[in-house]
Amino acid sequence: MKGVSATPSYVVMQPTTLCNLDCAYCYLPFRKDDKRMPVAVSAAVAEAVAPWSRTQRFSIVWHGGEPLAAGRDHLAALFAPFGPAVEHHIQTNATLIDDAWCDFFQAHDVRVSVSVDGPEHRNGERVTRGHRPAYDRIARGIRVLRRRDIPFSALCVVGRPEPGLATELYDYFLDLGCEVLGINVEEQEGVNERTNRHPAADVTAFWSELVAAWRRDPRIHLREIEWSLRYAAAVLDGNADAVLPRRLDPIPTVAHDGSVVLLSPELAGFHDPRYGDFTSGNVLTTPLAQILAGAAGTPWIAEFLEGVEACRRTCPYFGFCGGAHAANRYFEHGRFDVTETDHCRNSKIRLLEGVLDHARDHEPTAV
């Protein structure tokens, strides 16, 4: 894997900066403001992705605020320029979901992912603008999805990964009814400056316990565990080099105003004296394909690619993770050519070690 691909597999789009919640770990800088994406931005992106969607599966991920806060009429107008081959995904806090939104999801074949951190007592960081618990509203929205038979994924943020927690979380999500589950260990990024450094043994034990819980009842597609097992299988088959893509997915994030940040959505909306605003262009003035073709010319991206090569040279886990994410390098270290981050320790290194620990502990006994 070298360089940045000129063809993404999906585009992240920000229909509004506004979020009706005020989660303590959120990285977004403008979530109190309602800056809505003009339809002209959506139309420019739709024109760019049309040829890509004809040759591969292609998705638009509506994220970067609470997408439902943009309203059904405006979101429908943003969807309209895209062809039928483009999949639409929404990451939502679920608090606004009602039957009318379910009608919208079904009419537009939207794939829904909800953000919820486990049982009610695990959602203390997810609060309203008045700093009141949001769990009841989240759970109510999820109940509407289930009543309407709309499949959904779930995204769970874990603030303190430690032994005893993983089984509780997995059992909760089994009962919740999600089809896919992603586990994100809280990250120090954006406006969230809280440290995410944890004892290595605790994090490894958390992931190992999660594997055990999943193996007992693997009804849920557990994102991190399944990816780890695919990598382990590839190593055993001698195909480890084929796991990572040949080039980095550029993951273009198109902000509400059309500006484009590549590789890490978490950098959108931030500014640095050295790197500027991290953007590589704006779809209102430059076609997205042209922006992607010139990605390496963005100074911070060139520095990031140097960091990726440093990871390749020095880290035995590179074949699994492909190098620390750009935003984590920047928000933890202030630059992009560093290597190991707390995020990669928590969510890559300890993850793989936890999976391998579980495998060793449950290795069949020779007869």
Model regions: which residues?
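Cysteine-centered iron-sulfur cluster-binding motifs in ferredoxin-type domains/subunits
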Residues: 15-22, 66, 310-314, 318
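Short flanking/linker segments adjacent to small metal-binding domains or redox-active Cys/His motifs
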Residues: 76-79, 319, 360-367
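Canonical Radical SAM [4Fe-4S] cluster-binding loop centered on the CxxxCxxC motif
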Residues: 5-40
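Radical SAM enzyme [4Fe-4S]-AdoMet core and its adjacent flexible, acidic
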Residues: 129-136, 143, 147-260, 265-283
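Accessory C-terminal segments flanking Radical SAM cores
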Residues: 227-345
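Radical SAM/AdoMet-radical enzyme domain recognition
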Residues: 44-61, 70-199
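Conserved, mostly hydrophobic/aromatic
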Residues: 19, 23, 62, 90, ...
